[in-house]
From Swiss-Prot:
Location in or out of the cell: Cytoplasm; Endoplasmic reticulum; Cytoplasm, Perinuclear region; Cytoplasm, Cytoskeleton, Microtubule organizing center, Centrosome
Descriptive protein name: Ubiquitin carboxyl-terminal hydrolase 20
DUSP domain sequence ranges: 685-778, 787-890
Any Pfam family the entry gives: UCH
Family, as annotated: Belongs to the peptidase C19 family. USP20/USP33 subfamily.
Free-text function comment from the UniProt entry: Deubiquitinating enzyme that plays a role in many cellular processes including autophagy, cellular antiviral response or membrane protein biogenesis. Attenuates TLR4-mediated NF-kappa-B signaling by cooperating with beta-arrestin-2/ARRB2 and inhibiting TRAF6 autoubiquitination. Promotes cellular antiviral responses by deconjugating 'Lys-33' and 'Lys-48'-linked ubiquitination of STING1 leading to its stabilization. Plays an essential role in autophagy induction by regulating the ULK1 stability through deubiquitination of ULK1.
Catalytic residues of the enzyme: 154, 641
Gene from which the chain derives: USP20
Modification sites for Phosphothreonine: 259, 378
Length: 912
């Protein structure tokens, strides 16, 4: 794709350049000060062979360019070219290919025939996170942009700043913007993408006004309308759920076979699960942070460039060795959960058997586990497979009951769960529901983890296991007594019962509340050592994952014993997320009052280790996390102010984001903060070395006969994830191995071309695939799409014709009822809004059975009226039932003349 980057007028001043010359110069030293590489710069002016150091030393390369008026220089480590006059990167690929003496570049047209499809040239870009770590014209790092307060919107600003400083998510919206496509309103992903682009723009303003995103979130959830203070954690959940809904894509079934074919250590990180919400803050038993996100399980593109981008945009995370100012030249240009069911695994089996059954399923084909609001924390664990309602397209309903709390920071709303149905799956009335489809999005790829919840009967030792997906962990803050129990349990290696931890601040009357308030004031004026050990984040995690006894009013209903039994309940992490979101439960809301737990919780800036909390079946190799950002709340439960502390990924410094004001702070300020929400990122030196190795392979520029297309989205994961998982090219391929027709017109936004040596290295390291050397539209999908379009057209035309006849009928002999819930699904399908046809007609929601066994319409039911012909037509297509008629055939009315005669006779009789 040609663009202005190819039009540098100074290219004519370049002499002959060959790969051998550049490699030879890369081993030399600065001709002014004698310093050796890496990151020397070579002048490209005709007849000039000067090699100078960069800004990590004395920057003689820049001094030479200014003194000699030589505009073009090339970095001898990354082989990227900078023009001082144009102040931008330029690309030499077309020019290099034109010089016969030099070796043909590895991606020249001689190496492989031009594609047979009308694709624009696909850029060769292996972009590293560091590539986006470029700086301003004034040498200030990017991302230091404030956000204007729109009226008590600090909760939103703090949350957005914290998310903005999560590199995997930000890089997706910056580098993979072409994947941000949705037809769902209010297109919040577009608003968020625009906001991120403004915040991280090279010419960033001092602050931005997030009006569009604020308006969109208010459309999604009415709770955020008005100007009342809200809870930043509720905002985060709502925002990420909506982003997931808008960006989710179905998981291609054949992708599972790819993970089986490769023996990759990191394959589990690519496991596709639908997104889920975090749990209620009301109860603390043992696993209270699983949540219900609904039908999306969890994993986008950057605008393409021209073939000239074959210049290899791979930035080095080794760039840590390059000075940050050096990156201005080197990278300045580069920024241009559904699921409805909690997966209860083999309830009647022992845990080993259950886990064996789970492991037999490839990660990408396992049934989506819901973000159910913590079945493991319900007072009485239900042994049935819990059926949760799928996440609505708009999370509005999750908050309706809590608008009254809008004036104060909210707890993690218990209404985040869907209603738990009392029917087992086998009891769902005769309708076969649509086959459940697994979904993933960038949100679920980054934030989704899973926990294994186990409940053991202490009488028969039966163990029930449930796999749940979480988006964040809501941790209780242990009190002094709970802390002593936890430490005692840790040192004695015995299970602790943390149940009281979550309730320690709950069962308080007014008097207890006043006493507690006075105590807190005294504590705040007294040195912390006087009160004993400080609560740590590890203590909160230990309290969360500790075993919980089920006895008394909270006994376990054992399926095997068929009785209420004493039991024990605990959970372990089965899969770690790439970014771990931790929510500390500081707010308690009672009927008459609310209050805030202001206890300081110390947290590590680096090296948070979750190994003690992992299940033995956990396949995540990287278990340590480094802090990215922390959201703090200053004030009380009724009022206050949110700010965020974030580490800038460019220079590693910490900054305070207080609405439109951004201030650099020392890390000790962060450590002493009253944390409310924390974002941790997996840390791995091995991942950094892996990126450096790929940079080196790409810099070799070996000629290759084959070019390999790789998913731009997966490449972004490779550049920003510690465990990217197997290569997943099914983000741009269909199940038949071709390009889906609906993606063909923007395929250059979905793929990146890699040289053969880079592909072979990535494939041998991560597995996955499949290998793609040729892009073509899938003819099978095209036929299926045409057949589907024809089916839709026939169904909707037939319905319209039958309905018109029904409307024209003055006195229909019979009227049939149809569930509007099913009808809306069918309507979305025939109008092209949903690719999946509805399941069988399900009138069970609008039907009730009388004592005689007669089925009739339920009062207040959500139904529509259709003719008998329409019912027969739809029932023949989809099946289902039951059949409900609200008006049966009526007896024939008497003839008006005979009626008049009868009236006359009756009148005469009365007269006599």
């Amino acid at each position: 794709m040609g663009d202005s980057r190819d039009l540098c007028p100074h290219l004519d001043s370049i002499g002959e350049v060959t790969k051998e010359d550049l490699l030879l110069k890369s081993k030399s030293t600065c001709q002014s000060c004698g310093v050796s590489g890496p990151n020397l710069w070579a002048c490209l002016q005709v007849s000039c062979s000067y090699v100078g150091c960069g800004e990590s030393f004395a920057d003689h390369s820049t001094l030479h360019a200014q003194a000699k008026k030589h505009n073009l220089t090339v970095n001898l480590t990354t082989f990227r070219v900078w023009c001082y006059a144009c102040e931008k990167e330029v690309f030499l690929e077309p020019r290099l290919a034109a010089h016969p003496p030099g070796p043909a570049p590895k991606f020249s047209e001689q190496d492989s025939p031009p594609p047979s499809h009308p694709l624009k040239a696909v850029p060769i870009a292996v972009a590293d996170e560091g590539e986006s770590e470029s700086e301003d014209d004034d040498l200030k790092p990017r991302g230091l942009t404030g956000m204007k307060n729109l009226g008590n919107s600090c909760y939103m600003n703090a949350a957005l700043q914290a998310l903005s400083n999560c590199p995997p998510l930000t890089q997706f919206f910056l580098e993979c913007g072409g994947l941000v496509r949705t037809d769902k309103k209010p297109a919040l992903c577009k608003s968020y993408q625009k906001l991120v682009s403004e915040v991280w723009h090279r010419k960033r303003p001092s602050y931005v006004v997030p009006t569009s995103l604020s308006h969109g979130i208010k459309l999604v959830n009415p709770m955020f309308r008005g100007y009342a203070q809200q809870d930043t954690q509720e905002f985060l959940r709502c925002l990420m759920d909506q982003l997931h809904e808008e960006l989710k894509e179905p998981v291609v079934a054949t992708a599972a076979a790819l993970t089986e074919a490769r023996d990759s250590d990191s394959s589990d990180t690519d496991e596709k699960r639908e997104g889920d919400r975090s749990p209620s803050e009301d109860e603390f038993l043992s696993c209270d942070s699983s949540s219900d996100r609904g039908e999306g399980d969890g994993q986008g593109r950057s605008g393409g460039g021209s073939q000239a981008e074959a210049e290899l945009l791979m930035a080095d995370e080794a760039g840590r060795a390059i000075s940050e100012k050096e990156r201005m030249k080197d990278r300045k240009f580069s920024w241009g959960q559904q699921r409805t069911n909690s997966e209860q695994v083999d309830e009647d089996a022992d845990v080993d058997t259950a886990m064996a059954a789970l492991e037999q399923q490839p990660p990408e084909t396992q049934p989506p586990s819901p973000r159910s609001t913590s079945p493991c924390r319900t007072p009485e664990p239900d042994n049935e497979a819990h059926m949760r309602s799928s996440r609505p397209c708009s999370p509005v309903h999750h908050h309706e009951g809590h608008a009254k709390l809008a004036s104060s920071p909210h707890r993690a709303s218990p209404v985040r769960m869907g209603p738990a149905y009392v029917l087992k799956k086998a009891q769902v009335p005769g309708s076969r529901r649509r086959k459940e489809q697994s979904y993933r999005s960038v949100i679920s790829d980054i934030f989704d983890g899973s926990v294994l919840s186990l409940v053991q009967c202490l009488t028969c030792d039966r163990v029930s296991t449930t796999v749940e997906t979480f988006q964040d962990l809501s941790l209780p803050i242990p009190g002094k007594e709970d802390l002593a129990k936890l430490h005692s349990a840790i040192y004695q290696n015995v299970p602790a019962k943390p149940g009281a931890c979550g309730d320690s601040y709950v069962a308080q009357g007014w008097l207890a509340f006043i006493v507690e308030y006075i105590r807190r004031f005294v504590v705040s004026c007294t040195p912390s050592w006087f009160w004993g050990p400080v609560v740590t984040l590890e203590d909160c995690l230990a309290a969360f994952f500790a075993a919980d006894e089920l006895k008394g009013d909270n006994m376990y209903s054992c399926e095997r014993c068929k009785k209420l039994r004493n039991g024990v309940k605990y959970c372990k992490v089965l899969r770690l997320p790439e970014i771990l979101c931790i929510h500390l439960k500081r707010f308690r809301h009672e009927v008459m009052y609310s209050f805030k737990i202001s206890s300081h919780v110390s947290f590590p800036l680096e090296g948070l280790d979750l190994r003690p909390f992992l299940a033995k079946e956990c396949t995540s190799q990287i278990t340590t996390y480094d802090l990215l950002s922390v959201i703090c709340h200053h004030g009380t439960a009724g009022s206050g102010h949110y700010i965020a502390y974030c580490q800038n990924v460019i220079n590693g410094q910490w900054y305070e984001f207080d609405d439109q004001y951004v201030t650099e702070v020392h890390e000790t300020v962060v450590q002493n903060a009253e944390a409310y929400v924390l974002f941790y990122r997996k840390s791995s030196e091995e991942a950094v070395r892996e990126r450096q190795q790929v940079v080196s392979l790409a810099a070799m520029r070996e000629p290759s006969l084959l070019r390999f297309y790789v998913s731009r989205e997966w490449l972004n994961k490779f550049n920003t994830f510690a465990e990217p998982g197997p290569i997943t090219n099914h983000t741009f391929l269909c199940s038949h191995g071709g390009i889906p027709p609906n993606k063909y017109h923007y395929i250059d936004d979905l793929v990146v071309i890699l040289p053969q040596n880079v592909w072979e290295h990535l494939y041998s390291r991560f597995g996955g695939g499949p290998a793609v050397n040729h892009l073509y539209v899938c003819s099978i999908c095209q036929v299926e799409i045409e057949a589907l379009a024809k089916r839709r057209r026939v169904e909707i035309d037939t319905f319209i014709k039958l309905n018109k006849a029904f409307q024209a009928e003055e006195s229909p002999s019979v009227i049939y009822c149809i569930s509007m819930q099913w009808f809306r699904e069918w309507e979305a399908f025939v109008k092209g809004k949903d690719n999946e046809p509805p399941g069988p007609i399900d009138n069970s929601r609008i039907a009730q059975v009388k004592g005689s066994g007669h089925i009739q319409l339920k009062p207040g039911a959500d139904y529509g009226q259709i003719s008998e012909e329409t019912w027969v037509y739809l029932n023949n297509l989809y099946g289902g039932g039951p059949e409900i008629a609200i008006r049966q055939s009526v007896a024939q009315l008497p003839d008006p003349e005979s009626l008049h005669g009868e009236q006359k006779i009756e009148a005469e009789t009365r007269a006599l």
